[in-house]
Amino acid sequence: MARKKASAVAQEDTKPLLEKGSTRKRLSNADDDEDHATKRVKGGIEERTDYARWRMRDDHGRHTWCYLEDDDALKQWPQTYADKYYLGLPLDLPELPKAKSPLDAVRNGLEFFEKLQLPSGHWGCEYGGPMFLLPCVVLAWYATKTPIPWYYATEIKNYLFARAHPEDGGWGLHIEGETSVFGTTLNYTVLRLVGVDADHPKMVKARATLHKMGGATHSPHWAKWWLAVLGVADWDIVNPVPPELWLLPDVVPFAPWRWWIHIRQVFLPMSYLWSRRWRAEETETIRSLRKELFVEDWDKIDWAGNRNTINPRDNYHPKSWLLNLINWFLANIWKPYFRVKPLSDKAEAWAMKLIEMENENTDCLDLATVSGPMNLVCLYAHGGPDTYAVRRHKERANEFLWVNKEGLLANGTNGVQCWDTAFAIQTVMDAGLTEDPRWRPMLLKALEFLDDQQIRENVKDQDKCYRQQRKGAWAFSNKDQGYAVSDCISEALKSVIILQKTPGFPTLIDDQRIFDAIDTLLTYQNPNGSCSSYEPPRAGPWMEMLNAAEVFGRIMVEYEYPECTTAVVTALSLFHKHWPDYRPKEIERFINRAVAWIKTNQLPHGGWYGSWGICFTYATMFALESLASIGETYENSTHARRGCDFLISKQREDGGWSEHYKACETGEYVEHPTGSQVVMTSWALIGLMKANYPDRARLRKGIKLLMERQQPNGEWLQEAIEGVFNKSCMISYPNYKFTFTMKALGMFARKYPDDTVL
């Protein structure tokens, strides 16, 4: 009962839109915000919160961070090891016996990692990195007059201050990137909206850097759109985003339903608000930002003339001549002379209908942290502040937020729950410890989580809202988000089969539900044999000529990925081993065609390019696993041998591997300047061992590095960022340093049980 009371208090504390009259005044609504701010510390917010009062609430895989201002609630809801770990607080764990073998290191790692398992059975983590995610949430809050609790505002300020570039004070596209106009414009705006004064030294420094880069007129398309929504910029600076495209017949080769899921879900709310030229209520803060963000007087800016103005460091993917021509025609001919209101009204109505279907399919969570806040603003503009959809969106926006030792950030989605849990299970399996009773309670909880998170039905009217079949699938995060992904289905399915075929574990997911997952997986193969992520490609790479984002590459359509292809191949192979009579010919054909594509995707240097992890090391690990699944290894396969030789050529003197995120951008292997990384080292070792690479001494050197990096309490420390999307933006997978590292150690221990390494 006490825990329920504490949880209720915490739940109330994490709903900024529902702040009671007794709570603090909203920091970003009225024109007298600055007057309110001066009554508090400099900047209108506190210096810091009390980290002993933060709790991460896990409700069936839904994460919300709670700040307990009530002392009774504080006593009733103690911090867990996971809370303290996420917040960077001391864990005061005892030192474990020093590992004398790789298997000892796995056990020590599991001793630590088990303490981070959450009540619903999964492992949480921050999924940060991109520096444009938090602005999406905060700018949407401000535009919709959503109260921002002081503890959110305080830790937002702390996080952005911590992540400012140490030399120029700006912000980049992601946490390890160079300062950009995109990152600096949006994050400077966030700080002003949460109450930081313009004359704060850090703001003065950031503003000077922004002005040196040309000011906000030199920002990319997405930033200009957000500034127009706030009323900080005029809508004329935004290139056309016509919702009429949603009215095109499906047969049109560039119709939006053919675009990659993330870009079409961003284009949807963008087009709705662009069409309406809606802007938030003007405040003193908005008027001040008009002076702070631009190098010219606001009234003298040629807004239309700056539609295509962009700083070179933001212009990762320059707009094509074709898109520039289309934009010119839409802005100068179609919009002023031929755009008729009945058609625009119809387009806006259909766009809103698609947003409403997204709400229904995700319970107002939406696909991710960019489209969700954008949809919130659309719903607010459409129906006002009191509709259920607006209130529910505001509640669920909290699930995108995360608190770490630096402050409050926004995750790339609402989490990595199913993905990380699947890898955690496989880690124990690869070490040969699934039958060890010591780890059975942990594994059973993980299995129960995957049981709970399997998606049991397809989306309502899935063809109407352009969704892929998903019955029997798993999402990247949780079933509320509900977007099936080929590799997420595959890794979760493998983990379920592994445990349910292990003596002592119950069969929670029956055969029919397993078959449902297989039926859905079999819909993911592309004509060339490969697999993509959310759905098979619906248009070709030529669509990148319409890429308006400027800061991203490979964003307009789905692409083929060796990582996703491998995951599906290995899942189908494992399934076929246990259910040989279910759709055997289709599965065999799928696997053969997929592995054949893997071979064609190999690069001249022997590696594979990774799109979801950094970079060649990541993809080569998966590709070698694909080849091994059909019996092709270093000894008998030219492709496997070339892949291994590529990895070995990158091994460092200390035995590790060290790939920098620049490899994703340049397409060439780039060494990380800080030296070997445990995650990259683990990926390389896993790939080599999957391929039966024969030189044990090379493997031992890498394993030795992993063991030496392990801390006395069993953990590994965070190193460089691990993940990537759209070639140019990096994203964090902090649990990889546990799951893949223990997997590599466990595989070595099983392969060479008598080799103690140290």
Where are these regions (language model features)?
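Preference for long, amphipathic alpha-helical scaffolds in soluble/luminal domains
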Residues: 1-758
